[in-house]
Amino acid sequence: MTISVPQLDCPLSRPVHPEGERADAYAVEWLRGVGLMADEADAAPVLAVGLGRLAACYVDENASWDTLAFMTILMAWYAEYDDRAIDSTGAIDGLTDAEVAELHRALGEILRDRPAPDPSDPVQRGLADVWRTLNGLASDWDRAAFVDTTLRYFEANRYERVNIRRGIPPTPSAHIGMRRHGGHVYGMYILGAAVNGYRPERRVLDHAAVRELETLAANYTSWANDLHSFAREHRMGQVNNLVWSVHHHEGLTFQQAADRVADLCDKELAAYLELRQTLPELGIPLTGATGRHVRFLEDMMWSMVDWSARSARYDVVPEAA
């Protein structure tokens, strides 16, 4: 099943870190180093995904190499974890639902600064290295909030597996609510501040308008990704996709559903821009750490559109005759 992905116009782009291609190569080196990729495996498919180029959108244009390298290994870990634990018709690498729950428990231990329960597991070993690198790079950041969002990410992932096993897409409303957690977008907002060195005030982060701005940005980012990933996920038996949900529950063709999702993206972007414009009048000037936080929300929005369209991550491999 393929669709013609509607073009999204997201006029929020900015210059990115110039070493994205170097970071792509580093992703391969790191994946091999932690055992998530065999030494003899062809590097070309990973390079074509462009994990380093995506990471280059999430750090400051003049950020240090160490900052870009960290964001790159984070993107690499997310991709491998997602493929091994979530994106399958039931279980992948022999992982049952119970084993995924146990994996999540083990990953939670790592995030509490405890040794990996099974250091022979490359997923655990990879996260342990990501966590060590992050805590060596960032200081005075909201670790507790990040751990909380990550545990919710894992919970949403198990919800996704339930839907896959049933073979029934969730309703659009249910999908939208859980998708924000299942994509770990809120966790990325915290990491953006940690690695790029800005610290928005708590009063700003707790403001109703800023929280809603984050929700609008998270929705746009998630839905744009759903549009581009639909064909690949459909082939893999995934049902946790807004295109699938709209098709199944609203009786539209897949193309009509994709067009509907694109329209929802456009409306969410318009609402985001409208709300952003009001922030200064609410006592939240878009300067300093606040302005940088808002900039990161937008980096995730536009880069998801740009990277998803260019990356081989969502290419569909034709079925064998």
Swiss-Prot record:
Entry note: cofactor: Binds 3 Mg(2+) ions per subunit.
Catalytic activity: (2E,6E,10E)-geranylgeranyl diphosphate = hydropyrene + diphosphate; (2E,6E,10E)-geranylgeranyl diphosphate + H2O = hydropyrenol + diphosphate; (2E,6E,10E)-geranylgeranyl diphosphate = isoelisabethatriene + diphosphate
EC id: 4.2.3.201, 4.2.3.202, 4.2.3.203
Coiled-coil parts of chain: none
Listed Pfam families: Terpene_syn_C_2
Enzyme class of the recorded protein, top EC level: lyase
SUPFAM superfamilies: Terpenoid synthases
Required co-factors: Mg(2+)
Keywords: Lyase, Magnesium, Metal-binding, Plasmid
Superkingdom as given in the UniProt entry: Bacteria
Pathway annotation from the record: Secondary metabolite biosynthesis; terpenoid biosynthesis
UniProt KW Cell wall biogenesis/degradation keyword: no
Residues holding Mg(2+) 3: 225, 229, 233
Motif (DDxx(x)D/E motif): 82-87
Residues that coordinate or bind Mg(2+) 1: 82
Binding site for Mg(2+) 2: 82
Presence of the UniProt keyword Magnesium in the record: yes
Single Gene Ontology MF annotation: terpene synthase activity
Motif (NDxxSxxxD/E motif): 225-233
Physiological role: Terpene synthase that catalyzes the conversion of geranylgeranyl diphosphate (GGPP) into a mixture of diterpenes, including hydropyrene (HP), hydropyrenol (HPol), isoelisabethatriene and traces of isoelisabethatriene B. Hydropyrene is the main product. Some other diterpenoids are also produced in very low quantities.
Entry's free-text remark on domains: Contains several highly conserved motifs that are important for catalytic activity including the aspartate-rich 'DDxx(x)D/E' motif and the 'NDxxSxxxD/E' motif, both of which are involved in complexing metal ions to coordinate the binding of the geranylgeranyl diphosphate substrate in the active site.
UniProt-recorded name of the protein: Hydropyrene synthase
Species whose genome carries this gene: Streptomyces clavuligerus
